[in-house]
Amino acid sequence: PLSSVEGQTQARLLRYLGYDVPDDEPMLFGKVRRLDERLLRALDIDTRSVGEIFRPQESQFQFLADDLYIDEWGIKRRFTGMYWDIVENPLKNATCADLDRYRWPDADSIDPAQIEAHVRRARELKEAGEYVVCAEHPVYGVFELGCWLCGFDDFLMRLFVDEPFVRKLFDIILNYQK
């Protein structure tokens, strides 16, 4: 029921339908571009999504250049025109001891006001009674983070040959998700 669309595509469609559209800017990975309300109404879409990936204030997040940043998990990403591709997996070939030394994001530093804003929006939509309200996941999953932190090849191999590492990594991620 959730929908999103790449920004340039949405802008072209809105212009085609006769709407004014501001210039588009690339979004960070994990941030979902909300479909423009005018487009949702024009297409008679009866769902509205609420939520986003929460970014803790205490993490490794930093911009390195206009097209390069390190996300809250320490994963380096480069904007390649449409997507933010992973260019560095910080835990590739890591050991269990490396997991102990790694700088993990602090879930307790997520701004409570950010969470409350989504709760308010969900309540407003529910009380209006016009749409099905769909919540988005506020954190990434354990499997995808494993692949992104270690690299797909490294992590998939570890699933079969390094159970202690995988269990420890999953415990850390699941503890963050609490």
Regions found by a protein language model. Name each.
Residues 1-178:
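Catalytic cores of TIM-barrel enzymes
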